[in-house]
Every structure is written in C-alpha cells, then in structure tokens.
A protein has these predicted regions:
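Flexible, low-complexity junctional segments that flank or bridge functional domains
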Residues: 245, 249-259
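Conserved functional hotspot residues or short segments at active or partner-binding sites
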Residues: 120-241
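Sec-exported extracytoplasmic/periplasmic mature domains
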Residues: 10, 46-50, 194, 198, ...
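Glycine-rich, charge-decorated loop segments at or immediately adjacent to ligand/cofactor-binding or catalytic sites
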Residues: 1-21
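Glycine-rich, aromatic-lined ligand/substrate-binding cores of catalytic
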Residues: 63-158
Length: 261
C-alpha cells in the first residue's frame, strides 16, 4: 500500500457502525472520522477481518499530521480532485458531516461549483437555522464559520431552483483543527431544522448504494441512532454526546497501535 496523507487529519468523531448495518459505504465498526491514513486503515482491516494477505505499507516521508497550518494536508501540496464533487481541502474537512446530506431532501450543492461544502433548499430560512444552531449547541459551531447563501443547482436536487442555505468555511483563519466537528455540526443543522419545522420532510426515502430496505441516512451512519436523535423532540445535545462519546473513546484506544506517524 503506497500511503498518502489523510486531508482531514487525525481527529475522531461520530458513531461506530453497528452490527447488521454493514454496506457498500460502511464495511466495518469504525466512526465517521477515523483519523487514519489509507495505509493505517488497511492494517486495521487486515487485523479486524483476519485477512490472509501479505500487507506492507510504503510510508509517507515527513508527514506531520499534528502540525499547522495544513495539519493533515501540507499547504504546499497540490490538490487533485479524487472525485468531481471533491474540489478542495475545505470539502474534505467538511465531508464527514456533509456526506449525510445525501440521505436528506436538502441539496448538498451538487450542480454547483462547491458541492459538499454547503446545503440548502428553496424553502429554508438559513439565518433562523443558524440562530437555532447557536442556541441549541454553540460548542458544536467551533472551528469554522457559517455563512448564509443562495445558490441554484444546474443538476441533481432542485435543479434550476433558487435555494437558500448555509456554506461551511473550515479554512483560513476560521479553521480550528481540534475544535471543528463536522459530524456534530451537520447533525446540529438537522436538529435545528427539525425544531423550527417539525413536519419538514427531511429524510430522503430512496434506494441508496445498493440498499433498498433502509433509509439512506441510517446506512450512512451505520445505524438509526443519529436520525432518531434528530427526530426526538425532547433530545438535547448532551444526549447525542452520551451516545457518541463511548464510541469515540473506544476508537481512540483501538487505533493507537495502527498509527505510523
């Protein structure tokens, strides 16, 4: 395995995939943000699934994921899109949260020049949503800057319609590597929408990545726990932390022996 930097760096965040929820987008019990390189993660998969392979990692020379300003991605390193919808480092940092938009009726910005860095819909009120996010869980807004925007997708959801939404800036002077929590940030946006618009048709019900009997948002998260938290009118921010913190602590210990850098 020829290793390469993880542009999102070392932070860990999110729920661990539960048994029975394995899919094309979730092969094993790891959190949304695992904080490993491909080489390190491959070694974990070899051990976890007891694969009988001769596995060797060609290590990165001089990679220092804990050093700014680039952290996981050295500033001088050229960005080459791994996908048409992965246009830059800001997207890579936000993606652990914005990927969940694929399981919703909200546009994730496909059909714009900045997909997976923003979200919205024609009927949203972004300033109200940001105010509710600030009221409900202000700590989850750290390490980035949110900006209300309008955009018009040229394809995909809401093609040709003017959408109102929110752009996530996890870059420049706004970016805090340790404090930015994209998975909680996007979860918070869902929660704010549910609190402001209780009957909003948020979850997209369609076949997703070869899964026909499960909601896409649950497939992406490896369980229904996140969706259930969003839809529970009595659930507070601390309730999601109560679900997630043990998974994050366990992964922090579990991955320790696989770190090469």
């Amino acid at each position: 395995m020829l290793d390469r930097p993880n542009p999102a760096g070392r932070p860990i965040e999110g729920l661990t995939l539960r048994p029975g929820w394995e899919s094309f987008v979730g092969a094993g019990p790891i959190p949304m943000r695992h904080g490993l390189t491909l080489g390190e993660l491959g070694k974990w998969f070899v051990d976890h699934f007891k694969l009988d392979v001769d596995y060797h990692v060609i290590e990165i020379e001089g990679w220092k994921p804990d050093e700014g300003p680039g952290f996981g991605w050295p500033p001088e390193r050229v960005w080459i899109n791994p996908s048409p919808n992965a246009a830059n480092l800001n997207m890579a940092r936000a993606y652990a949260g914005t990927v969940m938009l694929e399981g919703t009726t909200l546009s994730e910005g496909r059909g714009t020049t900045r997909p997976l860095e923003l979200f919205g819909a024609p009927d949203l009120e972004p300033r109200k949503i940001m105010a509710e996010m600030e009221r409900f869980a202000p700590d989850w807004l750290a390490g980035c800057k949110l900006r209300d925007i309008t955009f018009q997708p040229t394809f995909h959801k809401y093609v040709g319609e003017m959408c109102r939404g929110i752009f996530i800036h996890a870059e420049g002077r706004f970016y805090g590597h340790e404090s930015f929590k994209p998975w909680r940030l996007q979860s918070l946006a869902f929660k704010a929408i549910r609190r402001l618009y209780p009957d909003y048709d948020l979850w997209r019900d369609f076949p997703y990545e070869y899964e026909f009997d499960k909601l896409a948002i649950d497939v992406i998260n490896g369980s229904p726990l996140l969706r259930e938290w969003v839809d529970d009118v009595s659930a507070e921010a601390r309730d999601l932390d109560t679900l997630t913190d043990p998974d994050e602590r366990d992964w922090h210990e579990q991955r320790r022996s696989y770190l090469l850098y």
